[in-house]
């Protein structure tokens, strides 16, 4: 189940990015809810919030190391992990893999989901992989805080 969820996240992420490239690239943002939600094509050559721009090699090495470490941990401890820990790892691996594929293929990550928050603050544009990574991080932090996640190696 964990592997299937990981693959589903990667497929959904990559298909949504292909659609963004086809229908949003070189076009005005597609407004869904005025002054709140739009689809806007962005080529992100950095990390979250645009930090570390043009550090492709760095991101490839770090992402690959994280994917290897987390995957090995998951395989080694699969039988003792609870379902929420497995969910967190599936989301993390799926999201990281989706953005990793972009960095290898294009040299940047395709982002396209855009929200304007209070006082028209433009929240950084993101994608499905980013959502999976953020949700996994929140879930894993929650599990660690409430002692539902055992770290063993």
Q: Can you say where each PLM-predicted feature lies in the sequence?
A:
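Alpha-helical transmembrane bundles and membrane-interface segments of multipass inner-membrane proteins
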Residues: 1-153
């Amino acid at each position: 189940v964990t592997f299937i969820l990981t693959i589903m996240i990667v497929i959904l992420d990559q298909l949504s990015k292909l659609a963004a490239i086809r229908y949003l690239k070189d076009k005005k943002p597609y407004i869904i809810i005025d002054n709140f939600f739009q689809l806007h094509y962005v080529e992100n050559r950095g990390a979250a919030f645009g930090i570390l721009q043009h550090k492709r090699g760095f991101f490839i090495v770090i992402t690959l190391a994280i994917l290897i470490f987390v995957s090995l941990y998951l395989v080694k401890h699969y039988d003792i992990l609870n379902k929420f820990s497995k969910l967190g790892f599936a989301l993390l691996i799926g999201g990281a893999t989706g953005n990793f594929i972009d960095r290898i293929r294009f040299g940047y990550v395709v982002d396209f989901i855009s929200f304007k928050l209070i006082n028209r603050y433009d929240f950084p544009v993101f994608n499905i992989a980013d959502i999976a990574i953020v949700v996994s991080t929140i879930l894993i932090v929650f599990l660690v805080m409430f002692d539902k996640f055992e770290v063993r190696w």
